[in-house]
Regions:
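Glycine-rich nucleotide/cofactor/substrate-binding loop typically near the N-terminus or early
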Residues: 1-29, 151-167, 172-174
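General beta-strand structural signal in soluble alpha/beta enzymes
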Residues: 35-38, 53-58, 64, 86-88, ...
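Anionic-ligand binding region
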Residues: 124-151
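Glycine-rich phosphate/adenosyl-contacting loop at the front of the ribokinase-like
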Residues: 250-283
Length: 283
């Protein structure tokens, strides 16, 4: 919805633009500031206008040491209350991926991988060491799963993890080593909170001499390809009338219908309270 000049203006803002999550939206809008939305902020806007799916690089998560600092990305809580599917390359390895997946499970967020593997991707590498319960092998399958989430009126979102293309996954080991070094650098400089991620990514780019940026671009392009294919299939479901609408259960054919009359059995109990008012002193 932006003009070319508006896009150029925002792109030139750089770090002056406010990192905008759910908590920042009202302040940024009321003050007329320029903000760049996080996954959380984008989910809020998408849910408001009925956009059921969008693509990003990776989602935020639970930071290491969160049991002391409570440093948990607002992306996760938003996924638990906005019915929007997020297509991404998983969670950056600078975060505690295991606890991130546990948090999403607790908040009722469906997490699935795209492809044959159940292993959740770790942004720069296809393998995080953590498996998720579900995977979708085709855009059609992913769209159907999103459709059912909308049909049931669930208020939670979904995460579809797309592994980085194999052509760039070979850089994973080098990038992982650089990430660990960058984390140590951030700790020594006492960088914390929302400043950690941009610092680490910039430092990793320096340590890998631009290779991490190349891999980052490749995975975002791949996410966009997969996400657009899923969106197309979801649009087809909308055209045939199943999108976001409850589907009727097909009638059982006579061939498979029960041959005998079945009497239902109800097991359980109920408590009923009676209130009575006496009209006579002696009953």
């Amino acid at each position: 919805g932006l003009t070319r000049s508006e896009l150029e203006y925002i792109s030139k803002m750089g770090k002056s633009a406010i990192k905008t999550s759910r908590r920042d939206l009202s302040a940024v809008l009321s003050k007329g500031l320029v903000g760049g939305t996080t996954v959380s902020g984008t989910m809020v806007a998408s849910a408001m206008v009925g956009i059921p799916i969008f693509v990003t690089g990776g989602i935020g998560g639970v930071h290491y040491g969160a049991e002391r600092t409570f440093d948990v990305s607002a992306d996760l809580s938003e996924l638990g209350r906005s019915p929007v599917a997020v297509v991404c390359a998983g969670v950056k390895s600078i975060l505690d991926i295991g606890l991130t997946l546990e948090y999403l499970e607790t908040h009722g967020v469906t997490v699935a991988t795209f492809g044959d593997s159940l292993e959740f991707p770790a942004f720069f590498t296809p393998n995080s060491g953590f498996k998720v319960p579900y995977n979708v092998k085709t855009p059609e399958e992913a769209a159907t799963m999103i459709d059912y989430n909308l049909q049931m009126g669930l208020k939670s979102g979904m995460v579809i993890g797309v592994p980085i293309p194999e052509s760039h996954a070979v850089l994973g080991t080098q990038i992982e080593a650089a990430i660990q070094q960058a984390l140590q650098d951030a700790k020594s400089k006492r960088i914390s909170g929302k400043e950690v991620t941009p610092f680490v990514l910039q430092r990793v780019n320096q340590l890998t001499k631009g290779k991490s940026l190349e891999a980052n671009i490749a995975l975002i392009q791949n996410n966009a390809l997969v996400g657009s294919q899923i969106a197309l299939e979801l649009s087809k479901l909308r055209e045939i009338g199943t999108y976001g609408k409850p589907q009727t259960i097909p009638n059982i054919s006579e061939e498979h219908a029960p041959k005998t009359k079945i009497q239902p059995v109800v097991i359980g109990g109920s408590n009923v309270d009676f209130t009575a008012k006496a009209n006579f002193e002696i009953m």
